[in-house]
Amino acid sequence: MDIKTLTSGALIKHPSRGLLLGTGPFRESAEPPDSGPAFYIDTFRLDDPRPWKIPAALHALPAEGNPPPPAPEIRWAEPSPDAYAQVFAEMMEQIAAGQLMKSVPAIPQFGEMLLPHTPRELILRAISSSPSHYPYAWWTEREGFCGITPETLFHQQGRRLETMALAGTARPEDEGVFINDDKEIREHEIVAGSILSRLSPFGSVTRTARSVLNLGTLIHFVTYLTLESDEQHTPAHWIRLLHPTPALGSQPRTENTLAQLDDWRSRLRCPLHFGAPFGFLEDGDFFCLVGIRSLYWQGQRLALCTGGGVVASSTLTHEWRELKLKRDTVRRSFHLP
C-alpha cells in the first residue's frame, strides 16, 4: 500500500502489534466504538469534540518497509529568539513568585518542502526510524502531521496501566555530567512525582528508580510507573488525569496555569497537536503516545516544533540551545537535511 497516494490515514506503532495503518473514510465520534479499532487524535487542549477517528479498514504493515524516498529539499527559516525570550522571562517571573515550579514553552521552526516532493513522504521516513521510537501520523488531503516519539502517555490493559516519566535531556557524550546535573534531575523528579501523585488515589502504584534512556542522538532520564487500578476506567478518564504531564505542561497543574501555558504556546505559534495524546484502541487495549518529535504540514509548508522544561535553575541561553539540539535530533530521525 502506497501511503503517499492515500488522501487520508492514521498510523501508529503498537508495542505488541507493530505498525498499524487505518485508512478512510474515517468516522469521527465523541465516544469510542463498542467494538473494532479506533484512533484517538486530539489537540493539546483536548478540545476536539470528536477525537475518536474510526477507520474504514485497518492494515498491519511489515516491520521492514520500503526504503524512504530520496531526501527532499526543504527551505528552513531560523526561528527568532525574541518571542521565546519574552515568554521565558514571564515564566521565570512566575517561578520566582512561587506561582510555578515548571512549565514547558514550545516553539516551531517553519520551512517549505519544494516540489516534486510532498509532505506525506515524511510518513515513510518516520516508519524507517529507530526501533526504539514510535512512529505515528494523521493526515487528510491538504494537511497532517507525523512524528517519531520515544514517549508513551500510558498503555491500558483492563485495570493495569503502564506509564513513564521522560524528562531531562542531554547529548550522549555528556552523560557523565548529566547524571549529576541538579537542574535536569529536578526537572525529571517534578514529572515523576506528579504522575505518581495523580495515579496513587486509584490503586497500587510501583515506580522504578530513575535511569538514563539512550536514544542515540539524545539521552533522557526515565522512570517507569505501573498502576493496578481498584476499578475499571475509560481511556478518556486516564487521558484527562495524566495529560499534560509536567514533561509538557505546567506544575502545579491548575486551570490557571494550563490557561497561561495555552497563551504562551499560542504566542509562540505552536501547532495545536504538538504534545497531544495520540492513541489506538481495540479489544479493550488502549495504547497512547505523547505527540512529540513531530512535523506538521499544510500544503507544502512545514512546522517542526520542540519544547523544553523551564525550572528555577534554567537559563535562557541553555534552553535556547536545547531547543536547537532537539530540532536537529528530529531532522536526523527523519533523515532530513
Annotate each predicted stretch with a short phrase.
Residues M1-T43, D47:
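A generic N-terminal leader/anchor concept
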Residues E228-P337:
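Conserved hydrophobic core element of enzyme catalytic domains
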Residues Y40, G98, F154, G193, ...:
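A residue-level signal for conserved active-site and pocket-lining positions in enzyme catalytic cores
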Residues H59-D82, V87-A89, G111-M113, E162-W264, ...:
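Contiguous alpha-helical scaffold segments within structured protein domains
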Residues G18-L20, R27-E28, T169-R171, V310-A312:
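Short, surface-exposed beta-strand-loop junctions and turns on beta-sheet-rich folds
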Residues P37-N66:
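Small-residue-rich
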Residues M1-I12, P69-T118, L122:
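Terminal domain-start leader segments
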Residues D2-R17, I107, G111-I190, E282-G307:
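An anion-binding catalytic pocket shared by soluble metabolic enzymes
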